[in-house]
From Swiss-Prot:
GO cellular component, one term: cytosol
Gene3D superfamilies: Aspartate/ornithine carbamoyltransferase
Keyword Electron transport: no
Protein name: Aspartate carbamoyltransferase catalytic subunit
PROSITE patterns per record: CARBAMOYLTRANSFERASE
BP term (GO), one: amino acid metabolic process
Catalytic activity: carbamoyl phosphate + L-aspartate = N-carbamoyl-L-aspartate + phosphate + H(+)
Residue pairs linked by disulfide bridges in the UniProt entry: none
Pathway(s) served: Pyrimidine metabolism; UMP biosynthesis via de novo pathway; (S)-dihydroorotate from bicarbonate: step 2/3
Length: 343
């Protein structure tokens, strides 16, 4: 869904069009071993349903760890996890750190502002140096789409890479935790109508969610938003597009709200935040148009009074905080699975 491309240099360049995503220098599926096992998690696109379900099933086993007096299992004891966040994050970085710690891994958070990359060192030189320190797993967030693919191609063979968000392209662990949340409350994906609302054009979460939902057999995925914030190509993916929020919400079982990604916008795509809320904000009245037992989700950070009303965010149908809780178990599952697979 995005044509952001990556050069073979240390500083990937993001192109403007969001319609396709291809890396011509990669052969086959770079996420999988020769035996079809998950070695890296770079995108949900192209993953077999069996692998997605395996991650969700494994996460279900880890949820109970949170309730233990000692919140640890020894799965990654002796392994080193490097969190490489070239783009700011609070929620994602923290949950990855907690997840790795609960797996008994040694965790290092690279201070990008104080690292050699801020002094002109290329991305690949940084990765090669960290690989030489016998890192086992890189968790990477980068502003340029494709950066985790570049790292996965060039890192040492023993290193595993998890994409924690790259540009507008993908946020696979968020997509997986969203799927876990939906499965927890709704169980059967094949009977659901799911609406994704808001700034889909700039949202890597939306892309990952759409790929995950279609992979898991959801029969109706709706994209709802203003024309200026919807990418092309949605219909070709089997997504129903709505430019009216009230129409799009009718009868849906799951609502995934997205914030406005102002930091990724170039030019004025909307009149104002206040006007946006009047037309596109999820209020109790609009929520009533959905199925009576519909759940409301949000990947965060959440902007109250812009895309969602506080009464909805804090209401009985909101599962937003549970998404955060489930996210730890899902990231534990992903790290545990990839670290156990190698060519």
């Amino acid at each position: 869904m995005t044509t952001d491309t990556t050069g073979r240099t240390g500083n990937p360049a993001a192109a403007a069009s969001p319609d396709r995503f291809r890396y011509g220098f990669l052969k086959g599926n770079p996420q999988l071993t020769k035996n079809g096992e998950l070695k890296h998690l770079l995108s949900i696109e192209g993953l077999p349903r069996s692998i997605v379900n395996h991650i969700l099933d494994t996460a279900e086993q880890f949820v109970s760890v949170t309730d233990r007096e000692v919140k640890k299992v020894p799965l990654l004891r002796g392994k080193s996890v490097f969190n490489l966040f070239f783009e700011n994050s609070t929620r994602t970085r923290t949950t990855f750190e907690i997840a790795a710690t609960r797996l008994s891994a040694d965790v290092l958070n690279l201070n990008i502002n104080a690292s050699s990359t801020s002094k002109g060192e290329s991305l690949l030189d940084t990765i090669n140096n960290l690989s030489a320190m016998h890192a086992d797993l890189f968790v990477v967030r980068h502003a340029s789409s494709g950066a985790p693919y570049l790292i996965a191609e060039h890192c040492a063979p023993h290193v595993h890479v998890i994409n924690a968000g790259d540009g507008r392209h993908a946020h696979p662990t968020q997509g997986l935790l969203d799927m876990y949340t939906i499965r927890h409350y709704k169980r059967d994906f094949t009977k659901l109508r799911v609406a994704i609302v808001g700034d889909i054009l700039h949202s890597r979460v939306a892309r990952s969610d759409i790929h995950a939902l279609t992979t898991l057999g959801v029969p109706e995925v709706r994209a709802i938003g203003p024309r200026t914030l919807l990418p092309g190509g949605l219909e070709q993916m089997g997504v129903k597009v709505f430019h009216n929020l009230d129409e799009g919400l009718k009868g849906v079982d799951v609502i995934i709200m997205l914030r406005l990604q102002n930091e990724r916008m170039s030019g004025a795509l909307l009149p104002s935040a206040q006007e946006y809320f009047k037309t596109w904000g999820l209020t109790p009245e609009r929520l009533a148009l959905a199925a009576p037992d519909a759940i409301v989700m949000h990947p965060g950070p959440m902007n109250r009074g812009v895309e969602i009303d506080s009464q909805v965010a804090d209401g009985p149908q909101s599962v937003i905080l549970n998404q955060v809780t489930f996210g730890i178990a899902v990231r534990m599952a992903v790290m545990g699975i990839v670290a156990g697979n190698s060519d």
